Amino acid sequence: MIALSSKPECGLGSPTPSPSHGFAENVGNLKDAFGYPDDLDWKLKKGKKLASVEAEDPIAAATMFAGIASEGFVSEMPRDNGYIRKMDDGTIVVLRVTTSSDGSPAVDLNIVGESHIRKIHFYKGDNNA
């Protein structure tokens, strides 16, 4: 689990799409803010890559992560529990404010060219240690 040291700004990313582009163009900003993907402790489970991020405000952190990951999205489908955004390269970014597994917020990344969906859960303190 990686700890997010500062409290992120809360926001759902850009309200309207910025110039469209693929997910790869957002990885540098995700690395700066969250250490993605190298600093996260990835575990393989049921065909998915799972990681956890510790944050002072897990919902704000998940929202920030999803906003950065989906910057430049080409379409969005709102959900009761977040949103699904599609990138120009076909990558899908899903924000779930509350998951059915344990109630934590999570971001799912279905990255074009990868064989596993990446799921990042966000926790407060040592709740998942």
Where do the language-model regions lie?
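Low-complexity, glycine/serine/proline-rich disordered segments
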Residues: 1-68, 76, 111-129
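Functional cores of ribonucleases/endoribonucleases
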Residues: 71-122
